[in-house]
């Protein structure tokens, strides 16, 4: 049974007033519908095509809803099966009286671009996607969209575009823009073939026989994870170390990498099963009210019935300002942030949330996000694991089995744990959250008795991504959900030596060097008196026992007991300097090395992958290219980490050696102006590695979403007052 879409109540209709559109586009619509019928094959048996050019002309002329189906490029795993979903959506839009169109945007895969020049284009691609979508929607005068949501920068790029369109249409006095999002299904993580597993276990045994127990343990750690693109990087790092020590040959290394790679991805694609930016975006956009629950959490491409439910709901949204994309997003911003936090979402989304709000016309920044995040404690209700059968594919199976309801369940459990949620906010079902949650069946997390991903009882009473301040920078972020309580304890209120790099390549090379700690010791990279002070701060119980040790012995003792803390700083990676690439690989090399993992944090003005875990601090502002304090740091400087208090400060080293915690950076900055100028010159030279057409000059900083300045300047609305949550009658637009 179909529903009937109302005509668009809008005095503006280029297809009525300009004959060229009615001459050009009917063949495009007919072609799309013909292909859709062919793709769906037997499912269309008995359906007689009624999409004549004359009928298409009439619908265009009379302002039937023109709905763009926005897909992604099939060179990204999330979009391999778009053709099928496009076909289902096109047929249903036509059956309901609309006019379907289709276009796709390029979609960068951050995994494919990882650790190569492509990563400098990743963040910029979000704004490029937004621009391309706005261009196409405005040029062809589409009223709404059905979005096949993929991974990485595409989801929030399209959210930003459509919120921007809604705002500009409303400014021009036109009908509100409506949209619904359909996340690609979850890709099933790969399994290591049993024969390969045995081979790699043999490598671990060989490592033990060579006295390389650390490699054996790290390799077995990697073997405990589901197979995915990010775990391949962990294997790569451990196998390189094994090769350096003569445990395996280069040829064996290549064979292992090949066998792992080809076993990684399921042939139907989807969004990778880890809780990275792709699945974090799934949860976030659902929390924004923009995803129909029928399509939110699937293990396979959607059926026709599932697509129909989403598209049919558009009938109650069309012409209703409450259900304009920008209004839905802003009305749900607190819901979205609390779901993002409770589900351990990606740090990337800190920028993307801010950007989407700015594109939607709302004045918003990182500090607004932080205020919402800390208005009330947000418990950790996400028991996600890549080693214990609780990845996002497992969550999707729990939802598809009818035991729970995905983000509706998380929304419910947040309220049960005392978190205020905006239940009156509109969603793309054409109803509010309150109406959606009034159906209690399968709502509680207790519906999954065994190995649940969503919990009713919190793991911890805090979660999410924290904003950090310090005396040498204005803002940075750390994914507190990505750190265990033990890790927090390990680095909190600790003094850490800076190990400085001005580019990621140098950092990666160094972090893979088996002799890194020995070289730091041999080069006397850290001042002896400062090492004694660090020992006293970080391990006071051992201070009297160890403080008189000579340099080498003290270094070894502190490294062995974990008292030596190192902040690996990768500078010059900000959006303007180098496109803000992810520092996933250096952090992965730290995490895959049990010696370094106890000692090292990573600090950068770059980003991190959504799958990154551990003590990874990024998005530092101002970035090095803009004279931020990170530009002036040197190996051997000392930072004081207060992660629970959300602070990192530069220590006065001389006072620290005297047993005092005094924070002073300005004197150091003034003394290092010449060093800063030398580094800025190197940054400008290195910047030429990125195509000039795609550099992000004229953009806001990471705390303000990294959006074009014009977008930020036009964002003047208040996200709490300039929204509409009052339900309006059908066809409310006049």
Predicted regions and their residues:
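Short acidic loop-to-helix transition motifs that present clustered carboxylates
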Residues: 108, 128-133, 153-154, 187, ...
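N-terminal small/polar loop signature for handling phosphorylated ligands or for N-terminal nucleophile
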Residues: 103-140
């Amino acid at each position: 049974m179909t529903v009937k879409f109302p005509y668009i109540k809008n005095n503006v209709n280029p297809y009525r007033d300009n004959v060229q559109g009615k001459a050009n586009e009917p063949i495009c619509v007919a072609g799309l519908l013909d292909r859709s019928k062919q793709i769906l094959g037997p499912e269309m048996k008995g359906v007689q095509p009624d999409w004549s050019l004359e009928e298409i002309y009439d619908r265009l002329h009379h302002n039937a809803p023109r709905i763009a189906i926005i897909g992604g490029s099939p060179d990204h795993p999330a979009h391999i099966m778009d053709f099928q979903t496009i076909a289902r959506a096109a047929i249903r839009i036509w059956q309901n009286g609309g006019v379907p169109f289709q276009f796709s945007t390029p979609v960068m895969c951050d995994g494919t671009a990882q650790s190569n020049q492509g990563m400098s284009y990743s963040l910029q691609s979000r704004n490029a996607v937004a621009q391309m979508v706005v261009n196409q929607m405005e040029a062809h005068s589409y009223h709404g969209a059905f979005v096949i949501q993929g991974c990485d920068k595409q989801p929030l790029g399209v959210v930003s575009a459509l919120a921007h369109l809604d705002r500009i249409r409303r400014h021009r006095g036109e009908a509100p823009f409506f949209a619904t999002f359909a996340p690609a299904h979850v890709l099933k993580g790969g399994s290591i073939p049993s024969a390969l597993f045995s081979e790699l276990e043999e490598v671990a045994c060989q490592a033990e026989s060579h006295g390389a127990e650390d490699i054996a343990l790290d390799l077995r750690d990697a073997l405990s994870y589901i197979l995915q693109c990010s775990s391949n990087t962990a294997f790569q790092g451990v196998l390189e170390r094994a090769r350096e020590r003569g445990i395996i040959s280069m040829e064996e290394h290549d064979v292992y990498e090949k066998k792992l790679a080809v076993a990684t991805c399921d042939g139907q694609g989807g969004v990778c099963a880890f809780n990275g930016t792709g699945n974090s975006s799934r949860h976030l956009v659902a929390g924004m009210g923009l995803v129909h629950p029928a399509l939110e959490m699937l293990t396979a491409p959607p059926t026709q019935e599932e697509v129909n439910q989403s598209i049919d709901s558009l009938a109650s949204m069309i012409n209703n300002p409450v259900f304009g994309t920008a209004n839905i997003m802003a009305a749900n911003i607190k819901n979205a942030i609390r779901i993002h936090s409770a589900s351990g979402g990606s740090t990337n989304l800190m920028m993307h949330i801010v950007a989407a709000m700015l594109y939607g016309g709302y004045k918003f920044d990182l500090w607004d996000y932080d205020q919402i995040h800390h208005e009330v404690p947000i418990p950790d209700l996400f028991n996600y694991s890549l080693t214990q059968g609780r990845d996002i594919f497992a969550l999707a199976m729990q939802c598809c089995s009818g035991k729970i309801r995905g983000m509706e369940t998380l929304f419910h459990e947040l309220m049960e744990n005392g978190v205020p949620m905006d239940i009156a906010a509109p969603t793309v079902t054409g109803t509010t959250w309150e109406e959606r949650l009034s159906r209690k069946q399968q709502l509680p997390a207790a519906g999954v008795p065994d190995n649940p991903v969503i919990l009713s009882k919190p793991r911890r009473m805090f979660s999410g991504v924290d904003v950090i301040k310090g005396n040498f920078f204005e803002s940075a972020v750390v994914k507190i959900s990505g750190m265990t309580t033990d890790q927090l304890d390990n680095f909190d209120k600790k003094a850490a030596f800076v190990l400085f790099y001005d580019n990621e390549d140098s950092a990666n090379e160094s972090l893979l060097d088996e002799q890194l700690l020995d070289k730091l010791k041999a080069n006397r990279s850290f001042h002896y008196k400062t090492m004694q002070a660090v020992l006293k701060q970080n391990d006071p119980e051992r201070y009297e026992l160890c403080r008189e040790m000579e340099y080498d012995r003290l270094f070894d003792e502190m490294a062995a007991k974990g008292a030596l803390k190192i902040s690996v700083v990768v500078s010059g990676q900000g959006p303007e300097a180098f496109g803000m690439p992810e520092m996933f690989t250096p952090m992965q090399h730290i995490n895959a090395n049990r010696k370094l993992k106890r000692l090292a944090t990573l600090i950068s003005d770059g980003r991190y992958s959504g799958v990154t875990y551990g003590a990874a601090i990024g998005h530092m502002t101002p970035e090095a290219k803009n004279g931020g304090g990170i530009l002036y740091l040197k190996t051997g400087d000392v930072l004081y980490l207060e992660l629970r208090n959300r602070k990192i400060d530069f220590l006065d080293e001389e006072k620290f050696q005297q047993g005092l915690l005094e924070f002073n950076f300005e004197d150091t900055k003034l003394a290092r102006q010449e060093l800063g100028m030398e580094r800025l010159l190197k940054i400008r030279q290195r910047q030429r590695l990125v195509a000039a057409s795609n550099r992000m000059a004229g953009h806001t900083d990471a705390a303000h979403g990294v959006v074009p300045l014009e977008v930020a300047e036009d964002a003047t609305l208040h996200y709490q007052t300039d929204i509409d949550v009052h339900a309006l009658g059908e066809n409310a637009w006049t």
